[in-house]
Design a protein with these regions (language model features):
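Conserved catalytic submotifs in the C-terminal HATPase_c
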Residues: 107-118
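Short helix-loop "hinge" at the ATP-lid/N-box region of the Bergerat-fold HATPase_c
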Residues: 137-139
Length: 261
């Protein structure tokens, strides 16, 4: 897939992001200062106003990041593919379960299907974004007491990552219409998922889950030995720690926003 390499566009995008995130950072710093000093003395409307500022600031931060990500996916070259372990990605999702249960009263369960290591080729950061978007979408469909399952399933041609929920379900019985509505709509998150999968050669589908709810499935071709040169490490301790922290931070923001509504 060929993409434009617009240096001027990239510079403008970076400047736009820097200005927006600097302004949001100042807003958050002042909000934290006020919350800290008014924790005991502020009346209920003031505390609610500060909480609203926190949530809407996080929402704006996420929207800007998603818009920038969408621009990059649509206009920039695909980054060099690297081996990534889907089992490690599944473990990161599992670590979110306590916060999700505490904040949203929704149970998240992960299941590896007996798979211990599963190497596929892709862009690790994009794979993490994909999983977070799918989990967030599943959580939005659920009320308190709902359930979300994230699992790996072995396929003949690869491995499938499934994110399922027992929430409100799809509105159309036609699978083609479901994919058109949910993967081609205005929501940035699902548009990002679609682009990530198309660029990497992964197959994304949305279907009704047996028993109610929705099943999002991504099928990954397994990486061959030729895809992973001996000098290319599947795991790097320091890099994994950085990625894990970033994944947790993104997830915390999503949970904060989901808690609002």
């Amino acid at each position: 897939m060929r993409r434009r390499n617009d240096g001027a566009g990239g510079s403008l995008r970076e400047e736009f992001g820097d200005v927006c995130f600097h302004a949001l950072g100042i807003i958050d710093q002042n909000r934290e200062y006020l919350q800290m000093h008014l924790l005991a003395s502020a009346d209920l409307p003031t505390r609610q106003a500060l909480s609203d500022i926190q949530i809407e600031s996080a929402r704006l931060d996420r929207t800007i990041r998603n818009a920038i990500t969408l621009y990059q996916l649509e206009n920039e070259e695909l980054s060099e593919l690297q081996p990534l372990d889907l089992c490690s990605l599944l473990e990161k999702a599992g670590r979110l379960a306590p916060d999700i249960q505490r904040s949203l009263e929704i149970t998240l369960t992960t299941e590896s299907g007996g798979i211990e290591h599963c190497a596929v080729m892709g862009v690790p950061d994009e794979a993490e974004q994909l999983l977070l978007h799918l989990i967030s979408n599943a959580l939005r469909a659920c009320d308190a007491g709902g359930r979300v399952w994230v699992s790996l399933k072995q396929k003949k041609t690869g491995v499938a990552l499934r994110v399922e929920d027992n929430g409100c379900g799809l509105m159309e019985e036609d699978p083609i219409e479901n994919n058109r509505r949910f993967l081609s709509g205005a929501k940035l998150g699902l548009r990002i998922c679609k682009l990530i999968c198309r660029r990497a050669g992964w197959k994304l589908t949305l279907t009704a889950r047996p028993g109610g709810g929705t099943r999002a499935q991504v099928v990954f071709p397994l990486a061959s030995c030729e895809d992973i040169p001996p000098e290319m490490e599947l795991h790097s301790g320091e890099e994994n720690d950085i990625r894990a922290a970033r994944f947790a931070s993104r997830a915390a923001q999503e949970i904060l926003l989901l808690r609002r509504y």
